[in-house]
C-alpha cells in the first residue's frame, strides 16, 4: 500500500487552504451558468414543477390584499350606513371574504412548501452527485496536479464550493421566480386599483436606485479591502500559531504583535466604513419608502373624496407598495447569489474537467505473480521539458535484492520512486518489471505489486486493528496480529489501553512517531507486496527505536525486491547494490565496501555523516 503523510499544510500559511470568498466573481459568468444548467438537465421536469408551484404560490399571495379590500370596503360602508341609520355591517359577507382570503394564503403556503421541498431535493441530489464525482475524480487525477496545489485547495472544492453552490442554487432559483412573479403581479394589481397612484409610487424607484448605487459604489472598495485584510489577519494568526515555538525562541513577540496591530487597524478602518455605509441603505430606503407612502396616502385620500376608489383599495394599494420594494431588493440579493453560485460552479467544473491519468491501457499485461525483476533502461525525466533532472539512468535489479538509492537533496531519489509507481511517466527510456514495460500495465495492477513505507506515515482515525488491516482488508485478526509481531509492534500495542482495539485520533498523535512507523511496517507486511519502497523510513526517530524499526524492516524485506531511499547511510550498509545519485545521474554504484574503497563521492558523503554523528 502506498503510504501518505499524516498531515500536510493545507494552505500557504499551513491553514485550511483557500475557499470561496464572500461575493467572489467567476472568470466567465455566462459559461459557468451554462455548464450548471446542462448539469441540472436531468432534473428539468422537477425544475419546471418548482417554477409552476412558485408562480402559483405567488399569484395566490399577491391576490390576497385585493380580495381583502372588499372586506374593508364592506366594513367602511356598513359603518357609514349604521351611523346614518340606513343599515348595518354585513358581517356574513365580511366573514366569507376573510375565509376566502385565508384560503388563498393557505393555498399559497402549500404550494410554497411543495416547491421548497422539490427544490431542496434537487439541490441536495446535485451536491451529492458533485461530491461523488469529485471523490471519484480525485482517484483518477495525476500526481502532478496534487503536487502543484495545496490539499486545502482541493478539499475546498468538495466542501466550501459545493456547499456555496448548493445554498445559492436552493435560494436563487425560487427567489428569482417568486420575485419576478411578485413584481409583475403587484404591478398589475396596483394598476388595476389606480393608474395615477401607481405612477406616484413608481417615482420613488429611480430615487432609490440612485441612492443605492451611490452607497454600493462607495462601500464596495471598503468591502474588498475588508475581505483582503481579513485574509491577512487569518494568515498571520495561522502563521504565528504554527510557528509559535520559533516566535518564542527568537523573542519576536513584539514585532509579531506590531505587525498584527498594523493589519488589524487597517481591517478596523475598512470594516467600520463598509459596515457604516451599508448600514445607511436600510434607513434611506425606509425614508424614501415613507415619502412614497405619503404620496400614496394624499393622492388616495383625494381620489376617495371624489368617490373614485374606496378605503379598502387604498389600504390594499399601500400594502402592494410595501410589497413592491421587497422583490426588487430580493432580485439584487439574487444577483449576488448568482455570482457566488457561478464562481463556485466554475471552480467545481474546472476540477471535474481536469486532465486525468490513464488508468487502463489496451492489451494490458496481466501477471499472476510478480517475481521482482526491475530494469531501468536509459531512463530520463523532467517535471518540465526544459528542466531534466534524471539523465540516462540504467540499472538491473534481481528478485530479493536490496537496492539503496542515496545522494544529496534534489539528486532525484524520490523521483525514481514516483517513476517506478507511474505517478509520472518517463520522458525517455523505459522501466520494466519482470521484463514488461510498466506503461503496458494497468496502473492499479502495477501499484498492487508495490508496498511503501514512508517517514511521514499515514494513519486514519480508527482502531489499530483497522489501520493495520488496511494493508489487506480481507485479513483475519490472527493475520493482523502475526503481521504486528513480525513488525516488532505487538509488544507496544499490548501495552496500550485497549490493545489492538485502541482508537487512534484524527492525527494519530496518541502514539509516538516510532510506533506509527512500526504500524505502517506491519501494514506493509500484511499486504505482502513483492516489491517494496522504503523512503527515509528511519530518519526521524531515536537510535533505540531505529534499531527496532530496522529489525522490522529486515523482516519486511526478506525475500522481496526492496528500494531503500535514505539520507542516513548507516542504515543501508547491508544493501546488495547502492546507487549513488547526483544531479539526476548515477555517478557510482556498488556495495558499501566497494564504494568506500573507491574513495569517491559516496565515501565523502559517508565519512561526513560519520564525522557529524561522532
Question: Would you name each region that the model predicts?
Answer:
Residues 189-203, 273-346, 351-352:
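Helix-loop-helix
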Residues 42, 46-59, 70, 171-225, ...:
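Transmembrane helices of ABC transporter permease
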Residues 18, 22, 32, 40, ...:
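Juxtamembrane loop-to-helix connectors within ABC transporter transmembrane domains
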Residues 41, 99, 111, 115, ...:
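Hydrophobic alpha-helical transmembrane segments of ABC transporter permease domains
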Residues 143-144, 162-169, 173, 181, ...:
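An intracellular "coupling" helix at the cytosolic face of ABC transporter transmembrane type-1 domains
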Residues 360-361, 367-614:
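ABC-type nucleotide-binding domain
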Residues 29, 47-111, 192-196, 307-311:
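Transmembrane helix-loop-helix hairpins at lipid-water interfaces of multipass membrane proteins
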Amino acid at each position: 500500500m502506498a503510504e501518505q503523510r499524516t498531515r500536510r499544510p493545507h494552505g500557504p500559511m499551513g491553514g485550511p487552504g483557500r475557499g470561496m470568498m464572500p461575493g467572489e466573481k467567476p472568470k466567465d459568468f455566462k459559461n459557468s451558468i451554462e455548464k450548471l444548467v446542462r448539469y441540472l438537465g436531468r432534473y428539468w421536469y422537477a425544475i419546471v414543477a418548482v417554477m409552476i408551484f412558485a408562480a402559483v404560490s405567488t399569484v395566490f399571495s399577491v391576490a390576497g390584499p385585493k380580495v381583502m379590500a372588499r372586506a374593508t370596503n364592506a366594513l367602511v360602508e356598513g359603518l357609514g350606513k349604521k351611523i346614518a341609520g340606513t343599515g348595518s355591517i354585513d358581517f356574513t359577507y365580511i366573514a366569507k371574504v376573510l375565509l376566502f382570503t385565508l384560503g388563498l394564503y393557505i393555498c399559497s403556503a402549500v404550494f410554497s412548501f411543495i416547491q421548497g421541498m422539490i427544490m431542496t431535493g434537487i439541490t441536495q441530489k446535485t451536491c451529492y452527485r458533485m461530491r461523488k464525482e469529485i471523490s471519484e475524480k480525485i482517484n483518477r487525477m495525476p500526481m502532478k496536479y496534487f503536487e502543484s496545489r495545496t490539499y486545502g485547495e482541493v478539499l475546498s472544492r468538495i466542501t466550501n464550493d459545493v456547499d456555496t453552490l448548493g445554498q445559492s442554487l436552493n435560494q436563487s432559483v425560487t427567489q428569482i421566480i417568486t420575485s419576478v412573479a411578485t413584481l409583475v403581479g403587484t404591478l398589475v394589481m396596483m394598476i388595476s386599483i389606480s393608474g395615477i397612484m401607481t405612477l406616484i409610487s413608481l417615482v420613488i424607484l429611480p430615487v432609490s436606485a440612485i441612492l443605492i448605487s451611490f452607497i454600493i459604489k462607495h462601500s464596495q472598495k471598503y468591502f474588498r479591502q475588508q475581505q483582503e485584510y481579513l485574509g491577512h489577519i487569518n494568515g498571520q494568526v495561522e502563521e504565528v500559531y504554527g510557528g509559535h515555538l520559533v516566535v518564542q525562541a527568537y523573542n519576536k513577540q513584539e514585532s509579531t504583535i506590531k505587525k498584527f496591530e498594523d493589519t488589524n487597524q487597517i481591517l478596523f478602518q475598512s470594516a467600520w466604513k463598509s459596515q457604516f455605509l451599508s448600514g445607511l441603505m436600510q434607513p434611506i430606503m425606509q425614508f424614501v419608502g415613507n415619502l412614497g407612502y405619503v404620496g400614496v396616502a394624499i393622492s388616495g385620500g383625494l381620489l376617495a373624496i371624489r368617490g373614485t376608489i374606496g378605503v379598502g383599495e387604498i389600504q390594499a394599494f399601500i400594502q402592494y407598495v410595501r410589497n413592491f420594494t421587497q422583490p426588487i431588493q430580493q432580485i439584487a440579493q439574487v444577483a449576488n447569489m448568482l455570482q457566488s453560485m457561478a464562481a463556485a460552479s466554475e471552480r467545481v467544473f474546472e476540477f471535474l474537467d481536469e486532465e486525468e491519468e490513464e488508468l487502463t491501457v489496451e492489451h494490458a499485461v496481466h501477471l499472476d505473480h510478480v517475481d521482482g525483476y526491475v530494469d531501468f533502461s536509459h531512463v530520463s525525466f523532467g517535471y518540465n521539458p526544459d528542466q531534466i533532472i534524471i539523465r540516462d539512468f540504467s540499472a538491473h535489479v534481481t528478485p530479493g535484492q536490496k537496492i539503496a538509492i542515496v545522494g544529496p537533496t534534489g539528486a532525484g531519489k524520490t523521483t525514481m520512486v514516483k517513476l517506478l509507481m507511474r505517478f509520472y511517466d518517463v520522458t525517455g527510456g523505459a522501466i520494466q518489471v519482470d521484463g514488461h514495460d510498466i506503461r503496458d500495465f494497468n496502473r492499479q495492477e502495477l501499484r498492487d505489486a508495490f508496498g511503501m513505507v514512508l517517514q511521514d506515515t499515514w494513519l486514519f482515525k480508527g482502531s489499530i486493528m483497522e489501520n493495520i488491516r488496511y494493508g489487506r482488508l480481507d485479513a483475519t485478526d490472527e493475520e493482523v496480529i502475526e503481521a504486528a509481531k513480525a513488525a516488532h509492534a505487538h509488544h507496544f500495542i499490548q501495552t496500550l489501553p485497549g490493545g489492538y482495539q485502541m482508537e487512534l485520533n484524527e492525527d494519530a498523535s496518541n502514539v509516538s512517531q516510532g510506533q506509527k512507523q512500526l504500524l505502517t511496517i506491519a501494514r506493509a507486511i500484511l499486504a505482502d507486496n513483492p516489491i517494496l519502497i522504503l523512503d527515509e523510513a528511519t530518519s526521524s526517530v531515536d537510535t533505540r527505536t531505529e534499531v527496532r524499526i530496522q529489525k522490522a524492516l529486515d523482516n519486511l524485506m526478506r525475500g522481496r525486491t526492496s528500494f531503500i531511499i535514505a539520507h542516513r547511510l548507516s542504515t543501508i550498509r547491508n544493501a546488495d547494490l547502492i546507487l549513488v545519485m547526483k544531479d539526476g545521474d548515477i555517478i557510482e554504484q556498488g556495495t558499501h565496501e566497494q564504494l568506500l574503497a573507491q574513495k569517491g563521492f559516496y565515501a565523502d558523503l559517508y565519512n561526513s555523516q560519520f564525522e557529524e554523528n561522532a
